[in-house]
Amino acid sequence: MSMNSAQIRDAFLNYFAERGHEKVPSASMIPGNDPTLLFTNAGMVPFKDVFLGTDKRRYDKATSAQRCLRAGGKHNDLENVGYTARHHTFFEMMGNFSFGDYFKKQAIQYAWDFLTKELKLPAEKLWVTVFTEDDEAYDIWVKDIGVPEDRISRIGEKDNFWSMGDTGPCGPCSEVFYDHGEEVWGGPPGTPEEDGDRYIEIWNLVFMQYNRQADGTLEPLPDPSIDTGMGLERISAIMQNVHSNYEIDLFQALIKAAAEIIGTNDLDNKSLRVIADHIRSCSFLITDGVMPSNEGRGYVLRRIIRRAVRHGHLLGAKDTFFFRLVDELARQMGEAYPELEQKKQIIKDALEREEQQFARTLERGLAILSDEIGELKGNVIPGDVVFKLYDTYGFPVDLTADIAREQELTIDEQGFEQAMSEQRQRAQQASQFGMDYNQQLKSDNKTAFTGYDDVVGQAKVVELFKDGKPVEQLQAGENGIVVLSETPFYAESGGQIGDKGVLVANGPAFEVTDTQYIGKAIAHHGVAKAAVKLSDSVKAEIDSERRENIKRNHSATHLLHAALRNLLGEHVTQKGSLVEADKMRFDFSHFEPVTTEQLAQLEREVNAQVRANLPLQTQLMAIDEAKEAGAMALFGEKYDEQVRVVRMGDFSMELCGGTHVKATGDIGLFRITSEGGIASGVRRIEVVTGEAAVRYTQQQQSVLQQIAGELKTEPSSVAEKVQQLQHKFRELERKNEQLQQKLAQQAGGGLIAQAVDINGVKAIIAELDQADPKSLRGLVDDLKNQMGSGIVLLGTANGDKVSLIAGVTTDLTSKVKAGDIVNQAANVVGGKGGGRPDMAQAGGSLPEQLNEALATATTWLQQQL
């Protein structure tokens, strides 16, 4: 029975939902619970904490179709995509999971039942593998399911034993393969011919029943779990009776759409496969909040986009094409993933911008690479060439490697890495940044934070550091770190800077100049005003006025974030922030400058919420509950099971551990001071609030009044007055240029008479007194036309700058070139130049040498002609 991809996905999810499994929507491809992973690359990743026992869900069995990506780090399929039948950057992993509910027997029965009854695959076409030592699974397959022993293979630990890491949950696997029949080459799993295409793995069942200890021993888990995975693309190929995933309905629709957009009829071309695969990964990455950039996930996205664009170029694409595939992708997958349809325009805009940006350098980079390959002595493209393409023309390394492979060449990866390393060293030397001192310190203490409600608190000194080492006492005047049993001091985190203040014993004992985390301990950095010893009782007092200003700015970031999403779109996500006492800055994903009018709208919107005096409410809740309620979480941040939700009326709701005002009215006033780009796809807005915003407004008003006074007009008319002055200035510039041209023409009339003969060639070599450099070019052309055949070299000095222009009539360019002439003179005045054979110009910085420069050029011409 043939089924399309959507039908198979629905059948799988419904099958397990009908058997008591929670149908869990696909999580983001940006893992929220694992900072070690660049992307979600398996169906179990969103459940990792459940398997580890650090999280508990309201259900004990689940099913999902998880969006996955393999294009960076350890799991990197990028170079094979399009060239093999089953490699993809993006794929859907369907799975069923048990968290201590059912185990091995039920999992095997579910898999067999779904394959043979729901999908109606012939039992005789299925082949099974088990771990060599897993007799239990072997017996279930043979005795309970009835699989013949000659269609079961026992496989070793490398392929049939799964581990989450060197230690932790692990267990044996059992895999189900589909047999395409004798007409396809290949052998059963475990045989020397297993890499053939006859037997294709379709489902992997992982039985997590052990906990691997540090010494390698396996201890049985009290609640064994099940993790299974079946690739939608692979099972679709089998159900549609094709041997390549690219032949299934979903890919064929994308391939045909790409061919039509580009204008090619060769539907079997590998470049179309690459493009069809890459539009899926790129679109879903943007859906999940990733934008093209030069680092991290953003750079992986950029690499994939540029690889697709280059393959479009191979097919003859002359215009931007890649973004136009988003419509077809939304038609194919929008029902299963509504977010794709919702963010369609954002995806298209981001892809089109990136494609346009790369198009500016693609042709030039390809030409340079072609020249280098043409001059290549061996079969390895040098690392410095690969680096130049990367650094100057935006060619990702794997893109250059792709091109090399097509011509049976390789790249010098070691040489490239060496060039990259040298560049990084240069950047580090320029930045002058050192190691974070806190990273060198260790503390086993966990400080209780009391600062949400209090600005003063009693505590005991539990740890002291001096020069990075634990001590029992700090003497007066010594710099150090104090760790307390509890504290109202907020340690820098989440973009909010640490508190300042004082620790008091019998008078001020320790001035706190900064507060940071050391592990889970809150570290008070500063200088002792009196002796401080372990176990001392102190009163911790924060600088409450400074804290109030920080609270205003932090609450303002939440209002700004919500206002940005309302105004610009839901693609806006926080990329970073810095909340200080006197100002704050907010970095966010957006692909173009925020206009002046939009900035004004943002100010109006945020100040409206300030005037509304919305109450600020905080609540601790489960992370899943918070997300379901609509609380914004930052991509890539790791959150505890219990999170703090900060709500400002119905306008803003975010996960946040920082300190905030009691109501938005406490912010007072919100003013944006600047907006700009800090990286590709990332913008920054800087803001002041409260008293600082009042001072900023007054300063602006004062400057405006001063300008109005200078212009002798009212403040409301300043813009109009400036426009009038600009118009007058441009008119004067135009008249001045006309006058300079007339003066140059008059000077030119006299210059013709000064033409000298150099070995039968007429030449005009002269200095003009403070002539406009722009007018010299036209004058040289006029002189060449009047001479008919000849050479012109003119120089002028304006202040400390020298301008030189040389011209040669076309009949003489085979004998002497304008660029050579002008450089002879430029060398003398401390400059250089260049241009065409018939016209060239140069600059210099030694006006006192101009006469000598012209004489040098004359002597050189006498030698050349």
Curated annotation (Swiss-Prot):
Its cofactor is Zn(2+). Keywords: Aminoacyl-tRNA synthetase, ATP-binding, Cytoplasm, Ligase, Metal-binding, Nucleotide-binding, Protein biosynthesis, RNA-binding, tRNA-binding, Zinc. GO terms for molecular function: alanine-tRNA ligase activity; aminoacyl-tRNA deacylase activity; ATP binding; tRNA binding; zinc ion binding. It catalyses: tRNA(Ala) + L-alanine + ATP = L-alanyl-tRNA(Ala) + AMP + diphosphate. Its EC number is 6.1.1.7. It is an enzyme of class 6 (ligase). It is found in: Cytoplasm. One of its GO terms (biological process) is alanyl-tRNA aminoacylation. One of its GO terms (cellular component) is cytosol. Binds 1 zinc ion per subunit. InterPro entries: aa-tRNA-synth_II/BPL/LPL, Ala-tRNA-lgiase_IIc, Ala-tRNA-ligase_IIc_anticod-bd, Ala-tRNA-synth_IIc_core, Ala-tRNA-synth_IIc_N, Ala-tRNA_ligase, Ala_tRNA_ligase_euk/bac, DHHA1_dom. Zn(2+) binds at residues 554, 558, 656, 660. Belongs to the class-II aminoacyl-tRNA synthetase family. Consists of three domains; the N-terminal catalytic domain, the editing domain and the C-terminal C-Ala domain. The editing domain removes incorrectly charged amino acids, while the C-Ala domain, along with tRNA(Ala), serves as a bridge to cooperatively bring together the editing and aminoacylation centers thus stimulating deacylation of misacylated tRNAs. HAMAP family: Ala_tRNA_synth_B. Catalyzes the attachment of alanine to tRNA(Ala) in a two-step reaction: alanine is first activated by ATP to form Ala-AMP and then transferred to the acceptor end of tRNA(Ala). Also edits incorrectly charged Ser-tRNA(Ala) and Gly-tRNA(Ala) via its editing domain. This is Alanine--tRNA ligase. It comes from Idiomarina loihiensis (strain ATCC BAA-735 / DSM 15497 / L2-TR).
